[in-house]
Each structure stands twice: as C-alpha cells, then as structure tokens.
Amino acid sequence: MTQFTTSQQAAITHDGHDVLVSASAGSGKTTVLVERIIQKILKQHADITRMLIVTFTRAATAEMRTKIQTALKKALTERRHELSGEDRRHLANQIAMVNAAKISTLDAFSLQIVQTYYYVIDLDPGFRLLTDETERYMLQERVWDDLREQLYASDEAPAFEQLTANFSGDRDDSGLQDLMFELIRQAGATTDPKAYLEGLATPYAPEKWEATFSQQIWPRVKGQLLQIATSLTQASALANQLPNPIWYQQIQADLAPLQTLLETNAPTYDTVRSVLISHEFAAWSRISKGLDDADKDTKNAAKDLRDAAKKTWQNKLAPTFALAAEQIGDLLREAQPLVATLANVALKFEDALTAEKAARHVQDYSDIAHNALRILQQKDPQTGAPIADNYRASFDEVMVDEYQDISPLQEALLAAVSTTTPGDRFMVGDVKQSIYGFRLADPQLFIHKYQTFQDAPTDPAAPERIILAENFRSTKNVLAFTNLIFSQIMDPEVGDLSYDNAAALKYGALDYGDAHPAVKVLLYSKATSDEDSSDASELPGDADDNEPVDIATGQTQLVLAEIQRLINDPDAQLWDRQAQEYRRIHYRDITLLTRQTSQNSLIQTQFAAAGVPLFVADTKNFFKTTELMVMLALLKVIDNQKQDIPLVAVLRSPIVGLSADQLALIRLAAKQVPYYDAVTAFLQAEPKTPLAQRTHDMLTHFFNQLSHFRDLARENDLVTLLWAIYQDTGFLDYVGGTPGGSQRQANLQALIDRARTYEAGGFKGLFAFIHFITLMQKQDQDLAMPAQVDPDNDAVKLMTIHKSKGLEFPVVFLMQANKHFNMSDQTGTAILTKQGIGIKWLDPETRVEYELPQYQAAKAARQNQTLAEEMRLLYVALTRAQQRLYVVGATMSGNQLTSADKTVEKWAAAAEGEARVLAPQVRSGATSYLDWIGPALIRHPQARGLAETTIKPALVGDETEFTIEIDVNPQVTPTATPEKVSDDSGTMVDLSAWFKKAYPFQAATTTTGFQSVSEIKRAFDDPDTIDLVNADRFLGPKPPMRDLTAPAFLTETPSGISPAAIGTATHLLLQLVDLAKPITMASLRALRDQLTTTQVIAVDVAKHIDLTALIRFFETDLGRLLLAKPQQVHREVPFSMLLPADQVFEALADDPGEDVLIHGIIDGYVSDEQGVTLFDYKTDHNPNTAVLVDRYRGQLNLYAQALQDLQPKPVLHRYLVFLRTGTVVDLVASGAGK
C-alpha cells in the first residue's frame, strides 16, 4: 500500500471548502488526485457520476479514467473480505459507472453543455467542429478580405486607409490583417470579447491620461527606479568604506533626487519626467592617491554598480519620458480616434466571422466555450431554473487537473458550475510548470489563489492551500541544482513567484542508491580570447534560429562524446529502482530536450554520422521531405507554369529527371528571360545533339502530362488530381523504392488526406489549396503524426521541452542553453496584452512614428510575461531528469562564439550583489538560459577557481555538486564504421552467381508498405486466393476504386449518378444525424436539405438517398442501441496501424521482418462498460447476403483489431448493416467473423 506524506494525505482527505494543491515536479499529483477520488468512494460512499473531473488533453483524460477504474478494481479485489456487502455492491457499481463519469477535457465539457442546451441560445445543433488551425485561418482570411473591400468602398474609407497605413508596411496591408486576427484571438480568451474590444480605446482618452499613467505606467517605472535605488545604495555602502569621501558624495548626489521621487505619493508624469531628464551623473573621480589594492577593488565594485544604475536610468527610462505631458496629450488626441477605429473594425470583423461560421455550420473551440458560458448565464425555458444551478446541483465536487494552464474564460466556466459557500473546487497544478502562454493560459489565476489561500485555515469553510514539495523522481543533485538556480533567479518581480523554501523541491526518492551523479554543464567554446574575430562562427544560421550552424554542430559533438562515454564506460551506471541494483546505461535511457525543433535535422545528421541511434519525437519536418517538396512544386507549376523555381525543381526531380547539364542546355537557348521562356525556346529549336534530342523528348513528354494535369485541375477535385499525378508519373512507386520508402509513401498519402479534408471544409481550387499548404508551413503545422516511443527501441530520444512535460527520463541533456529567447512579439506597431493594446502612432503628415506610453507599458508587460514563461520552461526541462542531468550550451557574445574566459567574466559581473537573488536588471536583461544559469553557478563554492568572484555567504553551505566542462574541440568516434574491402588484385570474384541468384523476398516487391483497408480486404479474407507474384495490378499503389475507369453499367445509375456517390452521401447523413433526437422521415429530410443547401451533397445525389432504408435501420436492435446511447457512439473514426506483412499476405511468410501500414475509417462503434460494438454500413445492390458477408468479413476483422489497439475494451459484436435489404448481420454471433 502506498505510504503518503503528511501533505499528500491532507490533499487526499481535506474537503468542505476550496482546495488548491500546489504540486511541485515529481510530487505525485496524479496519484494524489486519483487516491482522493478512491477514498471518497470507499469512505464516503461518494458517487463518481456526481464529480466533475477536468483536465486539458484527451490523453490525460483517458489515462485518468483508466487509473481510477484500475484502482477501484484493485480495491474491490484486495479489500473484498474487509468490506461489507453494501460496500462491495457500492464499489462494484462505481466501477461500472466510471465510463459514465464526467471525466473530460474542458473543451469536451463545454461541448456537452452546448449540445444539451443549444436551444437556449438559438444555436443550430448541426454544427461541425472547426479543429484545423489552417482551415480556421483561411476562413478568417476570406471574411477579412470581404470586409476590407466593403470598408474601402464605404464612407469609412479614409479612416480605414489611415488604420491600414499605421499598422501595415509599404508593400501590403498584411500587418493590419495579422493584428486583426490576433485581436480576435486575444479577445476570445476573455469572458466578454466585445467588452474587451470596445475598451481598447479607453486608455487613450486624453482626459484619462493621468489615471492611465498612475495605474499602468507608474507602477512599472517605480519598480525600475527601485532597482536603480538598490544598486546605488549598494554602491554607496561600498564607497563609504573608502578613505576619500568623493565617491560616496557622488553616489549620494545621484541617489538623493531618486529617493525624494520614490517617497512622493502618486507623482505626476511631469514630476517623474523632471527627475529623469534633468539629472546629470557627474564623471567618476579617477583619484587613486591613498588607495591600497583592496580599496581599489572596492572602488571599482562601487563604480560597476553605479554604471549599471546609470545605464538603466539613461538608456531605458529617460528616453520613455522624452515628451512632456502636454505633447503626450496632443498625441493621444490624434491616436485615440485611430484606436477607436481599430476597435470598431475588429467588432465588425467579429460579427462577420460569426455570421460566416453560422452559414457554414461550424464552431471552433473558442465559440463552444463562449456559447457554453452564455448558456450557463441563462435560465432553462422549460423549468425556469438557472441552468448553472442545475449543474451545481449535479456535482458534489469539481476537480481540476493542471490548473496552472487555465484561461480566464475557462475559469469563468468552472466558477459557474461550482458552489462557493462552502467551496467545492479541488484544483491541482504547479504554476512553475505553466508553459502554455501561446494558448493564452493565465498563470496569474493560480498565483492569486496561491497567495490568498491559507495553509491549514482555522475556518473549516475557508479556502486552503496545500503544498506538495517532495520530489519522488530525481536524485539529490538534480533537485539541489534546480533549487540552486531558481532560488537566485525567480521572484515576483521576474518570474511572477517567489522561489522560497515552500516552493523549493524536497528530496523524497529515498529508494535511490548512494550515488548521486553531479550535474554537468557542457560548454562549447573558442580556444582563447585573442581568437575572437570574424570567422566561420559568424555565418548566419537557420532562418528560424539565431544560432550559427557550426556552433550548434559543436554542441552536438559535445553531447555525442558524452553519450559515447556513458555507453562505453562500465562505471557510468544507473540505479534500477525496481531491481534495487545498478545497471549499465542504454541509449533509450537518454533524452535530449530542445526549446525548438529548428536544429533537429542537424542533430539527426550528426547522430547518424556517429552511429548513435536517435528517435525524434517531434515530427515537424513533413513539408521539408523531398517527396513533399517535389509534389508541392509540381502543384505550383500546374497552377502557374511560369514560376521558375518550382519549374526547375520539378524538371530536376525524378518526375522528369533532367540532369544539371540538361538544365544548363535549356538555359543556353535563351539566357536573359524567365526559365519557362527558355524551355519554350528550347522546344521550338531543332535538337542538334543526342543530349539535346533526349532533353527535347523528356520535356515534350512532361509538358503533355502537365497539360493533362491542368485539365484535371479545372474539371475535377484535388484528390482525383493527386491520384492521377501519382499514377501517371509513377512517383508513388518511385519513392517506395528509396530509403524510408514506406514512410515517404505514407507522406504522399497524407497529402491526399489533407486535400480531402480541405475540400470537405467547403474550400475549392488548386490555387487556394497551395495557399492553404503555404499557411500550414508558416504556422509550423504538420501533416505527419508524432511518432510513438517504442520502449524496446534502444535509441536516444529527441523532443521539445513542451513535449516532455509530464514525462521523466533517467538521463537528460538540455540542449541549446545559449539560444536566444524569442522576443519577436515585443516589436512591431502594436503589442497586445490581456489589459489591452499598446500602439505606435504614425503621423500621416510627417510619417514620423511615436512610441506612445501605452506601447511602452504593453512592451514591458509582454517582456515580463516572456521571461517568466522562459523561466518556467527551464524549470520543466531540469525537473525531467531522474538521475543524470546535463546543461549544454556555448560561450557566446551576441551571435558569435567567444572564449570561455570572456563568458565567465560576464557571469562574474552579473553575479555581483549580496542578496541571494540576482539583481533584477541581470535577470530581466537575460537573453538565454545561460544568462541565468552562469551567474547563479559562478557564485557557488563548486565554481571556485573558474572566476575571481566572491562566494556569496548564502551559498557557502550549499552542497550541490556540479561541474562546468569547457571544450573547444570535442572528439567523436563513430560507433560503427564500414568494413574496408581488402585491396587484393590477385583475388577473382565470380559475380555471375550473384546475378543469377533468386531474390528471396520477391513477393515484397509487389506490395507497398502503405495500404488502405479497401485495397487489402480481399487478401486479408483469404490469402490463398491471391498469387502475389502476378498481382501487380491489385497490390500496387492505386487510387480508390471510384477513380478507375469501369463500365457504365457498373458505375452509374440510370440517372448517371454513381453508386459510390450515393453511398458516400448516405454515409455522411448517418455520420451527421443527431442520435439524441428521435429519427423521423421529417428530421432526415431536414438534414438532407441542409447538406444540399450548404453544397456538401449535390442535389442530384441527395435525391437518390434511400431515407426509408435509414428509418428501417433505426428500427432494428442495433439502431435502437445507437439511439439509446448517443453519447457513447463514435462515428467516422480514422485509424492507422502496423501489421506484420505475413499476416496480411501469406506469400510474405518468409519475410517476417516487414510491416504494412494500414489506414482506414471506421463507420462507427458503441463503447459501454461491457465492451465495444462495431458496425459498418454497406449500400451494395447485391441481394445475396452470404456473398456480401464473405466480401466484407476481412474488412471488419481489421477494424476490430484496430479498435482493440486503440482502447482496452473487448470488441463484443461486429455488425454489417446492409441498408438496401434492411439486413443486420452480427459476424460474431453468426460465426462469420472468423
């Protein structure tokens, strides 16, 4: 039985009031949350269906549900003899009810509210969830284009033109568009988007300027002035130790006006400005007479502190007060109308976007959340009771996991369904791990409760704070190192939270052995400081990365050398906590964490060269794969063949196959014209050489294909076009024969899937699709699914810090610790915050741009947010390590590699000051993790000898063990090298036998690694019926059957509509029909008409849907089951799975190492506490049920296997639903499923 700590036990048992559990990394918060639920069920006979349990991901929800059910079953088994009969019955009942419990994401909970009470807000329930970010962006883009044209043509055109000029560049008006999209996104995170937008101009009212200054600007300025005063006070204390008072007097002269200002209650803008602008710092006296060496050191230390304060005063603060209050008032009178116009346009855009979504019957998650909140603020028209009261009455407790990632909108939703007197909320999280600011999470909501809730309150109804500080994951040094860093860098001023004793990690993993390896800081560096000159290290890096490529390579080599040492050194071991013994380190124990994926390709290349296996968890390079780049280039050429770069890319690719010499030959035909014109000129000329003739023939063939593709693009959908390209060019076959062929073919298939989804969203046309893909690339979206970690795969793992959250690894390397923070959102003409907007105002007459005070305040607020989140990201990264932790970086000066001594000197200067926490200006001025880590370490006794710094008294007793290793030339030895062939000219090799030898895996050459269910269902049914050696046409890659030419009597009805089209439309109707309502002929007709109105189904096709057959189906036992359990019905479920090839194709039995990737879409299944009921609709005309069952048996076998892999429940029934005949066959019951 688990032994819980005192604080864990409190979190499990305390109730009757709101509880906030601040659970540090590795403190077992999920275990505590599950145990709290179990204890309530066991000891209080609580009903799990009366608990609302929410978290942020579907994976976490599924894991939570499984853990609760497993724990309840374990309790029933282990405590059966201790429990009374009533207790056993209650526990058994709760186990059965776990699947019905409200354990969900906040998005799913909001959706459930909307689906239940849609009629309260007059919402059409037949909406589709808009989950694709790129599709959402394109919808916004289309609405914005229409609105922009309307505004240019209206009376508001002059004001709109000024707005565009102020926020966009000279080339286009994309700046205003981007701002408008971000405004809508920011407003969407608030409880009242319209109020947020309407209030944007309020702080710009001239009459409210003083209030704006005192409430928004003065607190920030005062904080900076206090930092300056602290530095000057420290400098003054040092100067007072000197025999000559001149330096002390100089510093006091600087300090006096500052102290007077800070003592002033609510100073005006002009008062602050007067002090900052008028004060002059006297030149530092150079007198040295009478000073010994110690005095000189003290004098220099005082000067450094004064210089730092002077720099902040003169370079950061004074420039922001350049304008007098009167001048600011004049600017605000000009700027306020501009911001009011911005707000007005944003409101119109919001309304237009809402109307377009309604017309398309789509809702995104933000819409769902706002609609849910609107519903909770209404009364139920049927009962007259507030709907929120209904929810509050149905829950005994509201439990929230990962509470630190909550947004204001989500907080309002939870508050609406929670009681307050006494509170019934149980919130678990760690604000130090709040790393989702880009999703508009607001950690201040957690911090406010953390600071106001009490530890062990005397009032039983008062909200309580419980801190779980014990870490059961990591060794002592990992925790001590983390505490050492964060106790010096995190406080409310920079980091939002004080990293005090309560927040510090406590060692709790008492089962570790005696060895606690020291943390290592690995730095790639230059050899000596005199080498700091322009060289290769100045080469620009990736567009997405400030780090030069050679510096990233050096760091990777450092890591590789250390990994090879860990693997090869028998003394480098890990403690096996299960076996309670030491063991050797394996590659799979090691994980590399990065802030971004921009260097993944470089890291992969370096690891491959060294022979070190690497698994990349973040697949963000889909569009950078060769096959996708070639396909996108071809699509661009089909759309517009006069694009030089895509055209040359296609000509050079395997699709055409021209060599570099042939491309040069074409260019010689016309040198000073676009390349397409050169191709045209070349084709018109008479070929004079064999190479020219061959090139001419290849170009002629390609342009004939291109003409065909262009015709297809005009007359058909994108899926048909893409399949035609794959077939006619053989490109899909070609990539299958290259290294990683099955993955490349899967990538090309994913492009088709994306095209299908794109057109299903109502978008049409090749040009728009290319634009769609371009947007996906810009927004860093990917079509490839992240690969899943195989625990048996002995490979180093590479992933982002975000991806690692919630995970733990024996050995962790934090990479790129010198990489600059992304501050790009602190530039530009506007900065958005949750309080509003700060803008630069462009004078339309002079074209002079002014940074308004509101802009400076917004910039400071955004900078603080960014630094706090980067600090929390660092915390997450360090706390992933269980036993060994490495921090990897480079000694940098700007964007150049510098020597270690210069970097250490910079750290030592930043480490000055007596307080344990580093000076605020040092922490707020950091541009990378090393800017925090270096100064924090350099003050520690372990760093003695690395720099001439004073060890801080607060760190003298600190027992953290770490080393800083600097390497200028890391050496990596390839793990495996190719065996050299002996140079023996006297040896004759008979190659004829090799050429005559039969290839042992001939069958595999006629299959592809990527198969759809429809392509292999016959083979899966009865492998003996297929002769694989001669099955090229059946097994080769091909489009769906509807794309093949077939006799008209097979493919068309008398009206000319294909059965496939009717079947697809029928499936769509069954997918969208509302199972929560009675199914009638009228409701089916209404849904059909809606789909034709929105052009989802063609009118001609809709007429042939047999609605009577659908009514007949819902009258069967299976149909009634679907209607009885609508919430448990899952429809149109896509899946992919790997199967051993010899299971699918018997002829591959001799090749057991190969896998086949199978994909498909399951029509639907019902999941309840007993198991899963699978069903699949068929619209075949054949009346012979036995033949149809035989035809589709294998397909359902695959679906059942896929469902078994997706979730743990058994598949109890497999139904084939033949809609034409009204027959429903259970393959399991009939024995036909075997």
From Swiss-Prot:
One GO BP annotation here?
double-strand break repair via homologous recombination
**Residue limits of the UvrD-like helicase ATP-binding domain?**
2-475
- DNA repair listed as a keyword: yes
User: Which keywords describe this protein according to UniProt?
Assistant: ATP-binding, DNA damage, DNA repair, DNA-binding, Exonuclease, Helicase, Hydrolase, Isomerase, Nuclease, Nucleotide-binding
Instruction: List the cofactors.
Output: Mg(2+)
GO CC field:
cytosol; DNA helicase complex
Reported function: The heterodimer acts as both an ATP-dependent DNA helicase and an ATP-dependent, dual-direction single-stranded exonuclease. Recognizes the chi site generating a DNA molecule suitable for the initiation of homologous recombination. The AddA nuclease domain is required for chi fragment generation; this subunit has the helicase and 3' -> 5' nuclease activities.
Supply the name of the protein. ATP-dependent helicase/nuclease subunit A
The protein's gene is named: addA
